[in-house]
Amino acid sequence: MIQISDTAQTHFRKLIEREGAPGMGVRLSAVDPGTPRADARLEFAEPSDLLGDEWAVDCDGFTLYVDAASVGWLDGAEIDIVAGTAGAQQLTIKAPRIKGEAPGDAASLVERVHWVVENEINPQLASHGGKVAVQEVSAEGVVLLRFGGGCQGCGMADVTLKQGIEKTLMGRVPGVTAVRDATDHDSGHAPYIPRGNAA
């Protein structure tokens, strides 16, 4: 079930009335669902824009159309208008399932490690233009990683590995015993902090 606040409904209704297009509604869809890049998209939709398989949610003065392929990812979503900075109003969409759910305890160690790397670690490394890929997870729980992007050749890669990645994986994934770096840092082309420049 998708919840759209009265404030958000009033906001959309006013915008639609201003457009004056008969039958115009709002379409909601999930973009890249089940990935760390997942996002929700809201757009105005005229009847000719609709595919016909959308789920329709009756609102006050318009219809919210939910893309059929996105329904499962958007279940439990909340659309609202909240007070932003300097008194401005801001549209918010909270979709707790859009990025997928962490694998359960029954999932393999490899699946759980991959999920934490893709959904928690890589989004943080992306702020520096970096990433990390899981090369191997041994039966003993040793995770072998390969850095890329701005992390490959970075003078702080060892710190990132020990204080960030290893700490996160060992704290979030029972069964991980150690994390090792398999990266050829000498071949890094654009490190975030060049080796030798790290404090």
UniProtKB/Swiss-Prot annotation:
Q: Name one Pfam family in it.
A: NifU
On the tree of life, the source organism's domain of life is Bacteria
One MF annotation (Gene Ontology) recorded for this entry: iron ion binding
Instruction: List UniProt keywords, sorted A-Z.
Output: 4Fe-4S, Iron, Iron-sulfur, Metal-binding
What InterPro entries does this protein map onto?
A: Fe/S_biogenesis_protein_NfuA, FSCA_dom_sf, HesB-like_dom_sf, NIF_FeS_clus_asmbl_NifU_C
Task: Name one process (GO BP) from the record.
Answer: iron-sulfur cluster assembly
Which cofactor(s) does the record list? [4Fe-4S] cluster
This entry's comment on the bound cofactor is:
Binds 1 [4Fe-4S] cluster per subunit. The cluster is presumably bound at the interface of two monomers.
- For binding [4Fe-4S] cluster, which residues are annotated in this chain's numbering? C151, C154
* Cross-referenced PANTHER family: FE_S BIOGENESIS PROTEIN NFUA (PTHR11178:SF51), IRON-SULFUR CLUSTER SCAFFOLD PROTEIN NFU-RELATED (PTHR11178)
> What does the subunit section of this Swiss-Prot or TrEMBL entry state?
Homodimer.
Family named by the database record: Belongs to the NfuA family.
Query: What role does it play?
Result: Involved in iron-sulfur cluster biogenesis. Binds a 4Fe-4S cluster, can transfer this cluster to apoproteins, and thereby intervenes in the maturation of Fe/S proteins. Could also act as a scaffold/chaperone for damaged Fe/S proteins.
The protein depicted here goes by the name Fe/S biogenesis protein NfuA
The organism named in the record is: Stenotrophomonas maltophilia (strain R551-3)
